[in-house]
Amino acid sequence: MLHFLIRPSTRCAGSPHFNSTSSFLRKRLQSKTILSKRLGFQFRPSSTNVLAEVSTATSGFNPSWWPYALIQNTAYTINVYAGAPWWVSIILTTLGVRLALTPVMIASFRNSTKLSVIQPEMKKELEAIKTAKLDNDQLALNQHSIALRGIYLKHNVNPFAIFILPLTQSAVFFSFFYAIRKMSRLSVDGFTTGGLAWFKDLSIPDPYCILPIINAGLMFSGMQMNRANTASTIGNSTNWRTFFFLCCLLSPLLTAKLPAAIFMYWIPSSLFNIVQGYILKNPVVRSKLGFAPLPSIIEKQPSGFTLITNPIKSLKEFYKGVRDGFKTQYEQLQKDVSRRAVATTSASTIRPNSHYKKLKELNRSKKNSKKQSN
């Protein structure tokens, strides 16, 4: 009944890595030994073997507060205390972290939807600020900057808050990636047999490349769901949709050599995004969370559909769109630089020279008047 804490292992003792979790388990096992002597029976056949199992099971773990170490220790704790296989431990750790990040996600989505609503007002003021900078008009620049800050305060939004969620998710992704990759390379107890179905060994890649393909499809679905929920201008552009689809299409080729354990994080995380997207599409949920309502017209054709039916034409259009976009930006940049140069020259050169000429003419007229008076 009480022997589920540690599973048997065939490895020997003496691992150099022994963290605080292991010392805690050692104390628990010592107390069990004393209790078994008093009761007259043993909880385990041999406490020495159990201690060896604790030592070898923690190979590669560190008592650190870095995010990757916390992820490793959390998954290990679930594996040891619940007796769950490693694929279940990684999935439960993933879901726990994603649930912990839910408040950050809600705050970021609320801010993004408010920004999408006030985008016309923001665009007007930003264009005015840009024009004032090019014309070197400090008065207009200050006026429109104050007006833009007033819009942010009126609607209670922060334009920099949209970066919090992507940065947090990136940090979590790289922490999981590093933690699981390190676990797959080290001799962690039960990792080579802690898989499921055709991927029993979590430390090696999927031999049939099924997990990378499933992950690519779920990533694409999650991107579609988030694009529809935020309804942002960038996410709905044709070029960006094609680019995202190409990334998902090529991801199985780029992730085929990754250990199968990484997909025990990636696939549940993508499923979490899809479920989260379906929940956030509900108008009642959006109103309760303070989200702006979705636009009435959302493109129903899924992005990438044209790429599948006619890939050559779609790739040509994608290349043409990217090229035209860079060309337009370059031409606009040249115009802005020229306009800025003219404004700076007129402010620093033309006005002082004209003023100097007026002073010179005034002094000359004074001298002429003195000569005439004499």
Curated annotation (Swiss-Prot):
Q: Where are the transmembrane segments?
A: 77-97, 160-180, 243-263
Q: Which GO terms describe its biological process?
A: protein insertion into mitochondrial inner membrane from matrix
* Protein name from the UniProt record: Mitochondrial inner membrane protein oxa1-1
Chain ranges sitting on the Mitochondrial intermembrane side read 98-159, 264-374
Q: Does the keyword Membrane apply?
A: yes
A Pfam cross-reference name: 60KD_IMP
Q: Which family does it belong to?
A: Belongs to the OXA1/ALB3/YidC family.
Question: Which key words are in the record?
Answer: Membrane, Mitochondrion, Mitochondrion inner membrane, Transit peptide, Transmembrane, Transmembrane helix
- Tell me a Gene Ontology molecular-function term this record carries: membrane insertase activity
InterPro entries, alphabetized = YidC/ALB3/OXA1/COX18, YidC/Oxa/ALB_C
Asked if the record carries the keyword Cytoplasm, the reply is no
